[in-house]
Design a protein with these regions (language model features):
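Contiguous beta-strand/loop segments that form the cofactor/metal-binding neighborhood of enzyme cores
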Residues: 104-167
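Residues that form or flank phosphate/diphosphate-binding pockets in enzymes
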Residues: 2, 25, 51, 129-130, ...
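Short, flexible active-site-adjacent loop segments at beta-strand->alpha-helix junctions, enriched
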Residues: 20, 45-47, 74-79, 153, ...
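Alpha-helical elements of Rossmann-like donor-binding domains used by nucleotide-donor carbohydrate transfer enzymes
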Residues: 2, 29, 55-58, 105-106, ...
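Residue-level preference for beta-strand/loop junctions
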Residues: 8, 67, 131-133
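Beta-strand-loop-alpha-helix segment that lines the small-molecule cofactor/substrate pocket
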Residues: 2-48, 63
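Predominantly a Rossmann-like dinucleotide-binding segment in NAD(P)-dependent oxidoreductases
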Residues: 47-121, 125-127
């Protein structure tokens, strides 16, 4: 947060490695600083600019599947990590902050940036360092779209993205 804030206040646009912040308060403070200084702040989530993802967002937001009803996502892999920043809570470790961000970014893109999330169900498996090895979450987006996301360092490899609509 310190270097992002200093860079924004120095008039720089910032592309920050994920996770952007460790919690909503830190993240909001950085976005407030960006807005006050007229600077762009982006979390470095590579999938957001992938041509396949951009095309999916274009088709869905143009109504190709009607109104979005449900989004089903998974980003999971098994790992033998023992000494890695992903296991350190003070460095933004955990499956949710490491790979769950891809799913949340997709929800925002598909809802044209107006995503209001409400968690309806949450389950997680916590590892020995206190980080989540697996997080399984159900959410309601903008009160009309349901979504389910699984993020994990402990489940077999799966990268899935399914969007269901009224058509």
């Amino acid at each position: 947060i310190e270097w992002v804030t200093k860079s924004l206040e120095a008039g720089k646009h910032v592309l920050c490695e994920k996770p952007l912040g460790l919690n909503a308060i830190e993240t909001a403070a950085m976005f407030d600083t960006a807005a006050r200084n007229g600077r762009l702040l982006i979390e470095a989530v590579w999938g957001r600019w992938h041509p396949r993802f951009a095309r999916m967002v274009q088709l869905v937001t143009a109504g190709a599947i009607g109104d979005i009803e449900h989004i089903e996502t998974a980003f999971t892999f098994t790992s033998e990590m023992t000494d890695n920043y992903r296991l350190n809570p003070s460095m933004g470790g955990g499956a949710l902050l490491d790979v769950g961000c891809y799913q949340a970014h997709a929800w925002v893109a598909l809802t044209k940036g107006a995503a209001d999330f409400s968690i309806t169900e949450l389950a997680r498996t916590v590892g020995p360092t206190g980080i989540d090895l697996t997080t399984d979450v159900n959410v309601r987006i903008n009160n009309n779209v349901t979504a389910h996301a699984v993020s994990s360092f402990a489940l077999p490899s799966k990268q899935q993205f399914i969007v269901s609509g009224t058509r």
